[in-house]
Every structure is written in C-alpha cells, then in structure tokens.
Amino acid sequence: MKIMGKKARNAALVLAVVSAEQKKHALEMIALSLESQADEILCANNQDLINAAQNNMAAAMIDRLKLDELRLCAMIDSVRQIACLPDPVGQVINAWTRPNGLHISCVRTPLGVIGIIYESRPNVTIDASCLCLKSGNAAILRGGSDSFHSAYALHSALAMGLEKAGLPTDAIQMVETTDRDAVGEMLKGLDGTIDVIIPRGGQSLVKRVQSDARVPVFAHLAGLCHIYIDQSANVEMARDIVLNAKLRRTGICGAVETVLIDRQALEKFLPVLIALQEKGCEIRATEDIVSLVPTFALACEEDWSQEYLDAILSVKTVEGVEGAIEHIVRYSSGHTESIIAEDVGVVEIFFNRLDSAILLHNASTQFADGGEFGFGAEIGIATGKMHARGPIGVEQLTSFQYQIRGNGQVRP
C-alpha cells in the first residue's frame, strides 16, 4: 500500500504540469477504451449481480450495482463531458496589484493524491478517476467487494486509456483486494502521500472514514432530503416533482425521504400522496393525514430521521414555512431540501433560513447531482462547510496558491 502511495505521489507531480490538451486527450482515450471493452465490463458486472443475488442484497443496492448498455453509454458520455470542461488548473480566481507594485494572483492548483473508498457503485470508478485526472490529481481507488469484478474491468479500461495517451498509469491505481486492512492503511494517509479521502457508501463506511481518517475528508453521512409543499404551490407541479424525487431512483442520496405539507392546504395536496401510493410507494404519515386516507401507515418518531433508499416516504403536516424549517433543522443531514411554492416571499424565507448544501425551488431533489449541475460528473455530495460543499466536481478537487510578481520590492 505504501508503495502504491509513492507511485501515486510521483504520478501527481507529472499530472500537475500536464497541459489541458494532454488531459483532454487522455480522457478521450479512456472513453474509447470503455467502448472497446464494453462486453468485458458488462460480463464482469453480471458476475457481481449474480453474487449480489446469492447474498440477498436489497433491491435498491442491486440497482446501484447494476450496469447495462444504457448506463455504460451514459458513463462514457460523462467521460466525454468531463473532457470538454474547462481545465481548472491554473485558473486565476482573483488578482490585484498592491500600492507597492506587487501583483498578487490566487491560482487554482491540484490537491495532489486523492483516495476514494466506495462500495457498490461501479460508476464511481469512472467518475472519480476522470474528475481527478481532469483536475490534475492522482487517484487511489478502493472499491467494495460487491462491485469488485466491475471495478476491476473498468480500471483496466482506464489504464488502457492512460497508456494510449502517454500518461503514467500510476495516475489511477486500484487496490486489488477486498481486505479491510487496506482501508485502514489509506485512512492513515500512506506515509503522507494521500492528501484527501472521499468515501462513497453507506453510513457505516462514512462514519468509519470520518472517525479514523488522519487526512482531510470530503463526505456526507446521509442523504435525508426534504420537500416542503407550501399552500401556494401548484398541485400538478407538486405531484410531478414529488413523484420524480421519490420514485425516479429510490436508492440514490438525492431521493426525497420526507415530504412536509402546509397544514392549511392538506386536502388540496392529498392527490399527490395518493398518486405515490398508486405507484407502489408506502406512505408513513402523521395522524391527521392517516385519518383522511386510512390506507397510509402511521409514522413513528424514527421515520423522520430515516434514509429509506426505497419506495417509502414519510409525510407530515406543518404550520407553514416556519414549521417546515423547524422540522428540517432538527432532522436534516444537510444534503438537499426543496420547496414547492408560488409565493416568492415564502421561498426567500426558506432559502435564507436553511443551511443545507443544496436548496431547490420548484424542482426535484434528484437534481442534486454533479452532472445536472454541469460538472460533467461528481465524486459525491459534500455536506461539510470547509473547502468542498455540494457536488464535488473538478473545481472542488483543486486548492489554490498565491503567486506574487514583483520588480525588486523589499519590505520596509
């Protein structure tokens, strides 16, 4: 593992000075390699799916693990989108000239070596690697046992693309073991060679990384997303948004888990909940809602802090936007919250009073995604307040330095 860290550090030194065109070319070669290796990748993924079924993996987790031709094509498109993004390295964030003539520039620089620890999502192998490459960083990947065959096949395509582009294959390395001791070694920083750790997975993984890591961590613990439906909301819009936010993909961190409805307009928005139930979603609601629709289940206290990642939704009535804010502040994981409303004043209160990483107005929480932000892809959603926050794209994978140019100045 420590040798891997040293190789990554040496590769990072090369990537830091590679031109934007070289990186773009490497990403284009990776996309071509993924296309040429498609059959092998899907075959490897099928082996992971067979193992998952034998291990009685939950349906939502199998959905995360699954690759098909459509998802693989989307993955390849994402690589090409990343290739076409502006290169963040060397961008001048700000610049000014002091009265003494010193010209100061704040310039983006790579972070260095990024360790990515993840579980069952094969796309993380590609998204993380390509975002790191675009931002001039080396990557060390440690996938989970559930996606081992998929990740290995995808990494082979990555290495092929790097080699064709003339870049060091050590720029993207994969830990080829499922031994958990490897995670522990990465969390220690591999003798100072890892600069940042990014975990992608369940709460147990993220908690371990956050508690044991000796290097900075970009992470979110849970995607407990809320939607507040104000009395001023359009019913049809609310229906479309909530159905999408819950059921488009139930197993992703941007799926809504709790819907809060303005108590003054409960009957107006009952059709939204009934439509969800008709689509197979279990509704767990407060007593006033269940009294109107007895086929709904009665919610308990634990439901408000539950990330279901399934076709289950908690629903509660609240006293307007103030009640919604009070509930969200108490239970939110700081990931994503949405408000459906036509009253601009209510929207401003919602935006100004909540401090989650992503806030939306009249839009599905499933837009909490780097690709939807125009980032090409993302490594994850960071809910901390230091450095990276929200979708982690190429800019969030850079640091900065101050470059100062003078003409002989000395300090008096």
Curated annotation (Swiss-Prot):
Keyword Nucleotide-binding among record annotations: no
Catalytic activity: L-glutamate 5-semialdehyde + phosphate + NADP(+) = L-glutamyl 5-phosphate + NADPH + H(+)
Job of this protein: Catalyzes the NADPH-dependent reduction of L-glutamate 5-phosphate into L-glutamate 5-semialdehyde and phosphate. The product spontaneously undergoes cyclization to form 1-pyrroline-5-carboxylate.
EC number per UniProt: 1.2.1.41
Metabolic or biological pathway, per its Swiss-Prot or TrEMBL entry: Amino-acid biosynthesis; L-proline biosynthesis; L-glutamate 5-semialdehyde from L-glutamate: step 2/2
PANTHER family, per the entry: DELTA-1-PYRROLINE-5-CARBOXYLATE SYNTHASE (PTHR11063:SF8), GLUTAMATE SEMIALDEHYDE DEHYDROGENASE (PTHR11063)
UniProt protein name: Gamma-glutamyl phosphate reductase
GO biological process: L-proline biosynthetic process
HAMAP family named among the record's database cross-references: ProA
UniProt family annotation: Belongs to the gamma-glutamyl phosphate reductase family.
Organism, scientific name: Bartonella bacilliformis (strain ATCC 35685 / KC583 / Herrer 020/F12,63)
Designated gene of the protein: proA
Enzyme class: oxidoreductase
Location (main, coarse): cytoplasm
Stored Pfam families: Aldedh (PF00171)
NADP keyword on record: yes
Alphabetic keyword roster: Amino-acid biosynthesis, Cytoplasm, NADP, Oxidoreductase, Proline biosynthesis
GO molecular function, one term: glutamate-5-semialdehyde dehydrogenase activity
Subcellular compartments: Cytoplasm
Gene3D superfamilies: Aldehyde Dehydrogenase, Chain A, domain 1, Aldehyde Dehydrogenase, Chain A, domain 2
NCBIfam families: PRK00197.1, proA
GO CC terms in record: cytoplasm
